[in-house]
Amino acid sequence: MVSFKQVRVPLFTAIALVIVLLLAYFLPPRVRGGGRVAAAAITWVPKPNVEVWPVDPPPPVNFNKTAEQEYGDKEVKLPHWTPTLHTFQVPQNYTKANCTYCNTREYTFSYKGCCFYFTKKKHTWNGCFQACAELYPCTYFYGPTPDILPVVTRNLNAIESLWVGVYRVGEGNWTSLDGGTFKVYQIFGSHCTYVSKFSTVPVSHHECSFLKPCLCVSQRSNS
C-alpha cells in the first residue's frame, strides 16, 4: 500500500488539480436526487439576427391623395384624430369686405395697399372667418397669394404658424375669399391651411380644430 507521504506531485499540477475540482463543484448547478449528483451542461446559443427594418420597406405615403383614395375610406381612424372629408362649406355670413379701413396702430404690417393682422388670440381654422370679420371694420380671413406669402412668412418667427384663408370645398380647387386658384401642399382630405416661417406655399392641416392665430386683411383707402 502506498501512503500519501510517498506520492510526490509537482506543485503546479497540484494547484491545477485543486482549481479543476473547485470549478467542477461550484460552476455547474447541482441536481440532487436518488443519491446521485448530476451536473447541468452549459450550451452556447448563437445570438439570433434581429432585423430593425423590414426587408421591403413600406411604400411612401402619397400626400396628394385624399384619405379615401389612400385608404379606401372617407374617415381615417387614428388614436387622436379622425378627419372627415369634404364636409366644409364657406360660412355665408363671412365674405370679403367691400370697404376700406386700416388700424395703423394694431396692424402687423402693411403692404401693397393692404393692412395685415396676425390675431393675438388663437382660434380654430373655421373660427378664423368670424374672428377676422369681427377684428376691425372691413377685415376678413385672408389667403396669401404667391407675391404676399413671402412677406407674411418674414413676419413669423421660427416656431410660429398661423391659419390662412385658403380652402377648398369637396374635390374643388384651392381658393380664397378673394377668388383665384392656389397651389397647396396638401395631405389627405383636409380643407384648411396654415403657413409657418419656412412655407413656400400654404400647407393643409390634418386637424382644423387646432388653435392658431389667424391671418386677417383689410384694404387701405387711397387717401
Curated annotation (Swiss-Prot):
Keywords: Disulfide bond, Host membrane, Host-virus interaction, Lectin, Membrane, Transmembrane, Transmembrane helix, Virion. The keyword rRNA-binding does not apply. Changing residue 160 to A: Loss of HLA class II binding and fusion competence. InterPro entries: C-type_lectin-like/link_sf, CTDL_fold. Residues 111-217 form the C-type lectin domain. The chain crosses the membrane at residues 9-29. Residues 1-8 are intravirion. GO terms for molecular function: carbohydrate binding. It is found in: Virion membrane; Host membrane. The record marks 33-34 as: Potential cleavage. Changing residue 125 to G: Loss of HLA class II binding and fusion competence. Residues 30-223 are virion surface. It is a single-pass membrane protein. The keyword Disulfide bond applies. Disulfide bonds join 99-138, 102-115, 128-214, 132-216, 192-208. The C-lectin type domain is essential for virion-induced membrane fusion. Forms a complex with gp25 and gp85 via its N-terminus; this complex is used for invasion of B-lymphocytes. Interacts with human HLA-DRA and HLA-DRB1. Plays a role in virion attachment to host B-lymphocytes, through binding to leukocyte antigen (HLA) class II and subsequently participates in fusion of the virion with host membranes. May act as a tropism switch that directs fusion with B-lymphocytes and inhibits fusion with epithelial cells. Additionally, hampers T-cell recognition via HLA class II molecules through steric hindrance of T-cell receptor-class II-peptide interaction. This is Glycoprotein 42. It comes from Epstein-Barr virus (strain B95-8) (HHV-4).
